[in-house]
Amino acid sequence: MRKFTLNIFTLSLGLAVMPMVEAAPTAQQQLLEQVRLGEATHREDLVQQSLYRLELIDPNNPDVVAARFRSLLRQGDIDGAQKQLDRLSQLAPSSNAYKSSRTTMLLSTPDGRQALQQARLQATTGHAEEAVANLFNGAPPEGDIAVEYWSTVAKIPARRGEAINQLKRINADEPGNTGLQNNLALLLFSSDRRDEGFAVLEQMAKSNAGREGASKIWYGQIKDMPVSDASVSALKKYLSIFSDGDSVAAAQSQLAEQQKQLADPAFRARAQGLAAVDSGMAGKAIPELQQAVRANPKDSEALGALGQAYSQKGDRANAVANLEKALALDPHSSNNDKWNSLLKVNRYWLAIQQGDAALKANNPDRAERLFQQARNVDNTDSYAVLGLGDVAMARKDYPAAERYYQQTLRMDSGNTNAVRGLANIYRQQSPEKAEAFIASLSASQRRSIDDIERSLQNDRLAQQAEALENQGKWAQAAALQRQRLALDPGSVWITYRLSQDLWQAGQRSQADTLMRNLAQQKPNDPEQVYAYGLYLSGHDQDRAALAHINSLPRAQWSSNIQELVNRLQSDQVLETANRLRESGKEAEAEAMLRQQPPSTRIDLTLADWALQRRDYTAARAAYQNVLTREPTNADAILGLTEVDIAAGDTAAARSQLAKLPATDNASLNTQRRVALAQAQLGDTAAAQQTFNKLIPQAKSQPPSMESAMVLRDGAKFEAQAGDPKQALETYKDAMVASGVTTTRPQDNDTFTRLTRNDEKDDWLKRGVRSDAADLYRQQDLNVTLEHDYWGSSGTGGYSDLKAHTTMLQVDAPYSDGRMFFRSDFVNMNVGSFSTNADGKWDDNWGTCTLRDCSGNRSQSDSGASVAVGWRNDVWSWDIGTTPMGFNVVDVVGGISYSDDIGPLGYTVNAHRRPISSSLLAFGGQKDFPSNTGKKWGGVRADGVGLSLSYDKGEANGVWASLSGDQLTGKNVEDNWRVRWMTGYYYKVINQNNRRVTIGLNNMIWHYDKDLSGYSLGQGGYYSPQEYLSFAIPVMWRERTENWSWELGASGSWSHSRTKTMPRYPLMNLIPTDWQEEAARQSNDGGSSQGFGYTARALLERRVTSNWFVGTAIDIQQAKDYAPSHFLLYVRYSAAGWQGDMDLPPQPLIPYADW
């Protein structure tokens, strides 16, 4: 157990001693250090003793061989030294020991000594770089030569630090070299490394050889310190290290004197102030020196130091005042050179400061005088010239500013303010010139205006993005906005622009996320709140916009935010009012608006409503009310202009339009209204010029109601001005601007598909779609081929009708309407006469009741009619013929004019139309040849008509028609008629693509004579003297993407009465022999009443964009009238149509039935 304990103790002791053993130098290291010490102290005996032992221990050590080499060389044994050098080259040819030894050997030769002497001469005469280049190739030998080499290197400013480090290394290796220590200490003091210098002197003082030198250098470093606590401490430190010598005596005397002086408070304050100034502590120096000056106002040194302290603090005015006093008190002071230099500097910078202040106060004349004054003080510094450049910039004298800034840079290429000034000048001239200037700058100059370079790049990207936005290339614009955001991360408005572009590109979720993230990053930033509010309100999220704005304390709201809030709140009120008005409650909507606080916007809305309902008096009064508050309100002036135009007072309208204030900042909407007014006043050229300027502006804007309205009305104007093709292109832009689509349509199918109605559309989108569709269809070329079969039962030979009509119509654009060419081929067959037992016709036709008729019993005829015409929204006319080939052919046609009075639409027309209800009335027939053989029939209605309608798009509608006609025909008794028809309908379902109605119709007819017979002189058309009917129609109309249909039915009750009329009303047509009999014959009158019904089905299908097919069937059954129809048609669209199907389908109507 004891043995175990001893072993543990031994092991522990061993472990404890191991670090000490490892840390201790080896015998070889100790002996080598003794060699270096002996060489440094010139003790050759110490060198030889150490080498003897080293060569026994480690004879092949390169450092040992090198030491022996140096020893032999010092003894003059060149051969022995060469042998050691050769041996060293074999042992360690790459070692520092060999390289150093080889250099030392070289210096022992005459050439080497001469090269060294030459290098020393170069170093002495100030050519240190050449000396170093010629010495040793950067690898000096050891010893005094190495010290001399690195001392020479230290004379090169760029390598002084390297040289000091090398000398410190040599000092560590050769601690007794007092010459080295002397040089190193002086180098450290001159490099302002005082603490390191004193440490070297303290090391040097430990050797007898170096102590006196160290004492002199140390005292020289502290003896001239200003009297202060620091100077006393420095003297005490010196005296604690050195105890004898002349310097010590002087230090002791100086210490006693300073301690005595510092006992005086005034002197102490002065001394501490002077010391603080020397240390650069102006804040501490100023109160101390002020105290000293108060104690002795004529103390020039204190005044000068106080001026210096103020200069250090940047207080140029006080610096100048105190320095001037110091120089005046003691013009011959040893400090005069310093004070004069400081005075010049502070006078210069005082003038610069005052010039900057004058420029900031917008007083360029005073600034110019001060900068010129500074320039007179010092014409070598660049800032006075820079100031003159700033004055020229303030005066917008850019050429002069450019010259001054360029002069500034010639004086000081590092003056970044001059670089910035030139960059701003060139930026104003053109971005390209600014970029070229920046590219010419040095790296440091370029870094100084990095913000301008980024801004230029940002501006360039912004312009490129805007150009892409104008072209509708939103995704590409967004990519550029991302680059802008990378240059200016967190920018509110770049984020806003990027989000808007993404939204338009269809990346709406990403756009919303960007704006939400911005709000989270800058929750209390008013600019962010304003931008996000704009973003939300611009995408129909007004309530969300208000909620976000209200998250910011009201005290932080900017004027822009308040204006946005007012607009959004006003929008909500106006939205509610507009809904009320659109639902027919205009009075209630007006009442709600009049309850709101006074608002120009609301007053203008009320005025606009009055104008739309043609209440010009109320509209004028409302607009004048606005102008009373705001005499230059453009909307009110334009409103009065529109009132005068609507009232037909063009002179007053022109006068009002001339009152518009001239401005370059008029809104798009104001300019749009001006253009419309110009167009309505007939100033087409002016309107064209206004729209030519407006339309590109609107295209360049992000989608908005304002830009969409400009493009919509611009397209209308272009169409009216005779450029429908361009108008259609503008409608495509209007679709983007109004939000119908985010991508501009590139082909007809896409474009026309976008014209389809959408229940979610606001009034603007709905209008853009509708107007674009109307113009597109007006410009399309259509060809329609239709076959119609119709007939009604009756008496064979004249009223048992079966008719076929084949119609071909071509519609094409002309002016602002559509012209058409029409041809109908008509075949009418009224069957065959019945006969009695004798083969005679048993019918009341022609003159067969006066003389029997027999022979060919069938009656039919055919012919072709042609017609041309034109129509637009207001006028319609046509001219054509009845079927050529019939017995009676005439020219027919009509003209009509349509307009509205408020919600009441009306159409007036004048016409000449055939009566086509029978072969006799339409085409005429020919009496039996053996009787008279005369043609008669072909009845035409010449007259006028008025149609009225009231339908505001709501649930109820009313229509009415009144017409009067003169009825004439070939060999037919003249007649006239008056017809009144009216109806009411209720829309059970009233949707864009589906409508179900039920109504009540009434008809009242009156014919002067009953000429419904088929005998010679009769007309063969239904002509009761009284006719009254009531009907209840039900109609279902619907359309889908490629189908459209109408299903209808009605039940009716009618009453009619006819008078007894002569069977042969025109006796001149009857042969004389038959007239007496003819006069006795008549057609009995009478009355009847009964119920009837109708059923109708109409269907159309879009097969392709260009081809459409349709069919219809119509069955009618009523008292005295029961025609039925069946038709098929095909229509071709040259341009193609993918818009809404017609609702209901629109087959051709036989020209005879117009």
Curated annotation (Swiss-Prot):
Belongs to the AcsC/BcsC family. One of its GO terms (biological process) is cellulose biosynthetic process. Pathway: Glycan metabolism; bacterial cellulose biosynthesis. TPR repeats lie at residues 62-95, 266-299, 300-333, 348-381, 382-415, 458-491, 600-633, 707-741. Required for maximal bacterial cellulose synthesis. Residues 1-23 form the signal peptide. Keywords: Cellulose biosynthesis, Repeat, Signal, TPR repeat. It comes from the Bacteria. This is Putative cellulose synthase operon protein C. The gene is bcsC. GO terms for cellular component: outer membrane.
